[in-house]
């Protein structure tokens, strides 16, 4: 089986490529840079086949996908800077990547009868209540530009393809790229106290584990919508920060605050990022 992976310079795409290498599967990575520019740690992705690809260029998307001719595309590339997405000058760029780029990939997959696995987010929901969001729930109500763009990407994939997986994830962290864990480790070195919100609830998800799931999933025909997070229950960002400092031995004091008290974000965040993963388990997948 041959897999094309978008966004391999990011934290999830990086780990997906390395997981594919473990399976000895034929894989081609792509990103906007001329060559791979992710973290250099001696992992397989550094020497695996790579294609420069601007997913906002429809002609280029079709040219690359037709030439590589994969059996499946794992689409990890996305605009993920949630606050920057709110800037008026950035909105067209966000939608070009997350909506148009996703649509072009879906159309190209259809043209060669390839599967597509699209990475989405809990941000397609409004975060109200406390019940975990189910994968087949259609009560979409994004609170921000990023969430709306990812939802529109979902709708593009599901309207164009029949052979698709839409996997919503939340609170992702990994070795490559920027994430909450790295931010806490950096800030913890220079601050004796730190304010972290305690009223947004979700589940941290390690890209290493997520990559293993995605590679397993894409080899099946169990198409549909899924929610994928690590085990361990639901926690707040405050809880997560406390555990990070506990594990690393930092003595940084973490002060719990509400989202309103924190008040620094341009984009609204959902309070309830709990994702129900029972469907994932019922279909024989593990994370």
Question: What name fits each language-model region?
Answer:
Residues 1-23:
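N-terminal Rossmann NAD(P)H-binding glycine-rich loop of SDR-like oxidoreductase domains
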Residues 29-40, 55, 77-78:
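N-terminal Rossmann-fold cofactor-binding loop
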Residues 43-58:
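Rossmann-fold cofactor-recognition segment
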Residues 55-97:
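NAD(P)H-binding glycine-rich loop region in Rossmannoid oxidoreductase-like domains
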Residues 155-202, 208-209, 216:
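NAD(P)-dependent short-chain dehydrogenase/reductase
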Residues 213, 220-266, 271-272:
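Mid/C-terminal beta-alpha module of Rossmann-like enzyme folds, strongest
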Residues 268-287:
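C-terminal amphipathic/interface module of NAD(P)-dependent oxidoreductases
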């Amino acid at each position: 089986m041959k897999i094309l992976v978008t966004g391999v310079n990011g934290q999830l795409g990086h780990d997906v490529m390395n997981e594919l290498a473990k399976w000895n599967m034929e894989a081609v990575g792509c990103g906007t840079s001329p060559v791979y520019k992710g973290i250099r740690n001696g992992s397989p992705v550094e020497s695996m086949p790579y294609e420069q690809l601007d997913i906002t260029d429809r002609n280029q998307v079709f040219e690359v996908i037709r030439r590589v001719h994969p059996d499946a595309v794992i689409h990890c590339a996305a605009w993920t800077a949630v606050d920057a997405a709110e800037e008026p000058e950035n909105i067209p760029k966000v939608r070009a990547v997350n909506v148009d780029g996703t649509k072009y990939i879906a159309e190209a997959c259809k043209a060669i009868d390839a599967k597509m696995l699209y990475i989405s987010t809990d941000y397609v929901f409004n975060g109200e209540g406390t019940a975990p969001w189910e994968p087949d729930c259609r009560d979409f109500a994004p609170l921000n530009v990023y969430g709306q763009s990812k939802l529109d990407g979902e709708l593009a994939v599901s309207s164009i393809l029949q052979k698709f997986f839409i996997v919503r994830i939340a609170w992702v962290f990994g070795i490559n790229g920027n994430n909450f864990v790295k931010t806490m480790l950096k800030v913890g070195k220079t601050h004796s106290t730190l304010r972290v919100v305690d009223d947004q609830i979700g589940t941290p998800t390690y890209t290493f584990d997520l990559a293993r799931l995605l590679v397993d999933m894409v080899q099946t025909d169990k198409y549909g919508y899924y929610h994928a997070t690590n085990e361990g229950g639901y926690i707040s960002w405050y809880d997560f920060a406390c555990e990070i400092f506990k594990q690393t031995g930092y003595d940084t004091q973490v002060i719990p605050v509400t989202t309103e008290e924190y008040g620094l974000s341009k984009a609204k965040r959902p309070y309830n990022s709990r994702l129900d993963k029972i469907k994932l388990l019922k279909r024989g997948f593990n994370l």
